[in-house]
């Protein structure tokens, strides 16, 4: 065998061994860091997902965030392996706007959006000129207007994409409601200064509110269910498949039945 051919074969062998070792290392990943937000989201993971992953031999670290911005940047930068706090519309819009290569891997439950008040008990009590605190991020603001339209409080112009509704897209606001956009985490605190607040379920719960205390709760469409997300390059990794499987398990359904009644769920968890 010639010197050149021998070295070529050795090079191919070394590359093959290196690739195999790399794949083995990827498959052997046993530490997972998952980001989420305070309140119900971290509790859902702690009670329903973390135990299943630990039973499979993973060491799981849950990292809590107080906003909807940091978890995706932390995931894209490699500080997290996965996150669970957002619906797929928010994920896609955020990833596109910030040029992040992220992908959803499975749907999960969500504490529904709710209309809350310390002053009033029903939608019928909404008065003219009432001040309503609303989420300031575009996707959840659009979701809020669709929610309020269910009760005839506003109406969007014909042909407007319901996923992109803004205040400028409202054709009707019969009670001349005044909307106060705030960071989602601040909405519970706004209850003392406004007539109503439209609050994402996880932040309502983390602030001590109960879903049963809401003046009204959203009938959550499937596209607003939360998703677990990873970097796109990792979405088919064995550990990502294990995360997805945990969200689809009977164990998880039983946890939701016992500890999280009233949550909107994917069909597989009904």
Residue spans of the language-model regions?
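N-terminal export leaders
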Residues: 5-9
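Short, polar/charged alpha-helical segment
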Residues: 38-61
């Amino acid at each position: 065998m010639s010197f050149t051919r021998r070295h070529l074969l050795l090079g191919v062998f070394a590359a093959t061994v290196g690739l195999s070792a790399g794949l083995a290392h990827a498959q052997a990943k046993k530490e997972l860091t998952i980001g989420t937000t305070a309140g119900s989201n971290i509790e859902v993971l702690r009670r329903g997902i973390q135990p299943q992953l630990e039973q499979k031999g993973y060491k799981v670290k849950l990292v809590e965030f107080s906003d909807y911005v940091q978890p995706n940047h932390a995931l894209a930068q490699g500080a997290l392996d996965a996150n669970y706090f957002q619906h797929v519309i928010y994920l896609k819009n955020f990833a596109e706007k910030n040029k992040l290569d992220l992908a959803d891997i499975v749907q999960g439950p969500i504490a529904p959006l709710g209309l809350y008040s310390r002053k009033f008990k029903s939608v019928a009590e909404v008065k003219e000129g009432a001040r309503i605190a609303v989420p300031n991020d575009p996707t959840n603001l659009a979701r809020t207007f669709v929610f309020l339209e269910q009760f005839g409080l506003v109406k969007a112009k014909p042909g407007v994409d319901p996923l992109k509704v803004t205040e400028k897209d409202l054709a009707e606001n019969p009670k001349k409601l005044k909307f106060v956009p705030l960071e989602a985490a601040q909405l519970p605190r706004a209850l003392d200064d406004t007539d109503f607040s439209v609050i994402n379920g996880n932040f309502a719960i983390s602030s001590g509110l109960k879903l049963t205390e809401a003046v009204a709760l959203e009938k959550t469409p499937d596209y607003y269910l939360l998703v677990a997300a990873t970097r796109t390059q990792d979405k088919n990794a064995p550990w990502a498949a294990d995360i997805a499987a945990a969200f689809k398990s009977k164990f998880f359904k039983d946890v939701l039945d016992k500890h999280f009644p009233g949550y909107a769920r994917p069909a597989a968890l009904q």
